[in-house]
Every structure is written in C-alpha cells, then in structure tokens.
Amino acid sequence: VMDVDCKDQKIENISGVNSTKPEAIDEIASADLVTTAVGLVILPRIAPTIAQAIEKRMENGVKEPMNMIACENAIRGTSQLKKAVYENLSDAGKAYADEYVGFADCAVDRIVPPVKSENFIDVVVEEYFEWDVEKSGLKGELPQIEGMTLVDDLMAYIERKLFTLNTGHCITAYLGNLRGIPTIDKAIADEEIFGIVSAAMKESGAGLIKKYGFDPEKHAAYIKKIIGRFKNPYLQDDVTRVGREPLRKLSPTDRLIKPMMTAAGYGLPVDHLVIGAGAALHYDNPNDKQSVELQEKIGAQG
C-alpha cells in the first residue's frame, strides 16, 4: 500500500489456474461469487469459459445461485460481460442463468499502477478504495464482504466516479504527456495543468449535481480528495498507463465525452472538458495500438 504511510500487506489463502485450461471451468462452476479485473476489452475473451462453467452447473443440477461482478473501469461492465457470456450459452443455459446466475454491475475505485518489483505477483495500490455494487443484480442471499457497499441507484455512483476520478485522471495524463511529464503526481504539480484539471472536474461535477442532486459542498470535497490522490508521489503512476486506449476513453459513454455532453445538456459550460478531449486527440504513443489508430484516423480524416 503506497501512500503517506507505506506498508506491506500479505494476502493469503489464494491459488491460481490458467484461464485457458479446463481447470478454470471447474473452479468457476464451483464458485458462488466470481469477480473480474481484466480490462473491458478482455471480457469477451473470458466469456466462453464462464459460459462453459454455467453450462456445467446446469448439467450438474446446481440450484444454488452464483453471482458475477465485473470490477472494470467502465460503465455497466458486468452488463457487458453478461451479454458476452449469453452469446456463448445454449438456450437451456440462458434459461438456467436467468434463474440462478446474478450479474451485478458495480463501481470500483482504486488506483493500481504497474508494479516495479522483482516479485511478479506483487501488487501496488493506494490506501483509498471504494466498491459499490448494485443490489438488484444479485441473486440469493446478499454477500457480506468487507469493503463492499450495496447500493440501489448504482448509476449515480458510477457516473460520480467516472466524471470525477476518471475524467480528471485522464486529462492530467494527456496534458502531462503533451508537456513531456512522465507521472501523474508530477503532471498535477504543474500549475497550468492543475488549473485545467480542477476546472474540468468542476464542470463535470456541475452536470452531476444537476442530474443526481449531489450536495455541492460534499461534491467539492470529493473533488478535492480525488486531486489529493493524484498528488500521491509514492504511486509513480505513469501518464502512459492512465492515458492508454484513447479511442475507448473518447467514446460517447466514457470519461471525456459523456461528462461533457451531460453538462452541455443542462446548458452548463464545458470549456475545460473540451481542452481535455483535445489533449486526448493529441495523444501519440507508438506503443499504444489505439493511439496509433487514432493518429492514423486524424491523419486520414482530419
């Protein structure tokens, strides 16, 4: 845990199997709760394995419910996983899943930068975390897990996180990249970048307050807390990690365009959100497939 008080935390009682091996199907089929943290684009790749596990539960006559939660950095990630899983189920499997498999969307918030360690299983995280799970998507007895908050109106929490943390984070990364600044903490320390990011988060926040009725003072405090997380020098979070996959981040439902359109829809200013989106369009990283594709599109189409 890399923060003001850095500490090592040993996680025990874990095991692993290769997700491409039959053993993975057995492990999933015997679970009552399955969570993912693989990245949105990977969900369709693991969906066939999950579907096979559901089919196996059906064949074995398992009537106890199983719940799926995709802890991904996207809106309704579990719904997207469900769609991919159902595409790989038989009609009987779909009917079984409708009755016995829950797919609960969630909002997950914790900065996890790449690990600079000799031990490949080490993970670096910040102290702060939030995990909000939509109750209505769960089947059977509600799980009681430390750190999990069960909520009714998940979309408010999803968009609060997306429009605040994710929006501010990626704008910091793209502006930092334009200035040749390597890490988020150093980028947000730049006075001009700090000003643009803060203003953009206030613009997205104004849209959230209009849409969901968040308390303005509490939301201002939430923004301040998020910016404090960006300043954490212990994470050494690269702007290339935070800015990766710019096409996804520029999509209509993601962290740049969605908050801009929400605020603009209420007639609110979006000047600094536009600057952030513009910085994303300038993201040119030859090691990032989406960045290369983005620059090719701009070169060909303007």
What kind of region is each of these model predictions?
Residues 1-302:
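Substrate/ligand-engaging "lid" and interaction regions
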